[in-house]
From Swiss-Prot:
Region of interest called Disordered, as start-end residue ranges on this chain: 1-20
Record NCBIfam families: PRK08561.1
GO cellular component: cytosolic small ribosomal subunit
Lineage: superkingdom: Archaea
Record GO terms (molecular function): small ribosomal subunit rRNA binding; structural constituent of ribosome
One Pfam family of this chain: Ribosomal_S15
Protein's organism: Methanococcus aeolicus (strain ATCC BAA-1280 / DSM 17508 / OCM 812 / Nankai-3)
Keywords of this entry: Ribonucleoprotein, Ribosomal protein
GO terms (BP aspect): translation
Record protein name field: Small ribosomal subunit protein uS15
Disulphide bond pairs: none
Length: 151
């Protein structure tokens, strides 16, 4: 598939192994995995980082195979998922960093374009999350509120 804001195709990546059961060497139960996920989520780690830590430190290749649920679903079930979805939060952090950069480097037109693309992606995501009732209907993106939410 093509990239969103360019005419190029995406670079190739590795595919996940087609596995339907937990490997024999992964010796951790579903309950223990959920406890570790909830503990890390309470420490403030995002679901992607939790997945990396589980893979590298605990030897869990795929949380969904072990528990039957994704990391985000486990976090939602235990009420430790953040109010603002992580993808939207990360995009807002990126937009804030770009704004800080543009305050110091006012003539950087390439970063200005990147900020425009990032903020339009934020607006599309906000529209989606409002329609799916993840965010309140009156929630709007503005750089000032994003700065307050992120910091």
């Amino acid at each position: 598939m093509a990239r969103l804001h360019s005419g190029k195709r995406g670079s190739s990546g590795s595919t996940r192994p087609l596995r339907t059961e937990v490997p024999a060497w992964a010796n951790i139960t579903a309950e223990e995995t959920e406890e570790v996920i909830v503990k890390m989520a309470k420490e403030g780690k995002q679901s992607a980082m939790i997945g990396l830590i589980l893979r590298d430190s605990y030897g869990i290749p795929d949380v969904k195979l072990v528990t039957g649920k994704s990391v985000a679903q486990i976090m939602k079930d235990n009420n430790v998922y953040p109010e603002i979805p992580e993808d939207l939060f990360n995009l807002m952090k990126k937009a804030i960093n770009l704004r800080n950069h543009l305050e110091e480097n006012t003539k950087d037109i390439h970063s200005k374009r990147g900020l425009q693309l990032t903020e339009s992606k934020i607006r599309r995501l906000v529209k989606y999350y409002r329609n799916t009732k993840v965010l309140p209907a009156k929630w709007r993106y503005s750089p000032e509120t994003a700065r307050l939410l992120v910091e």
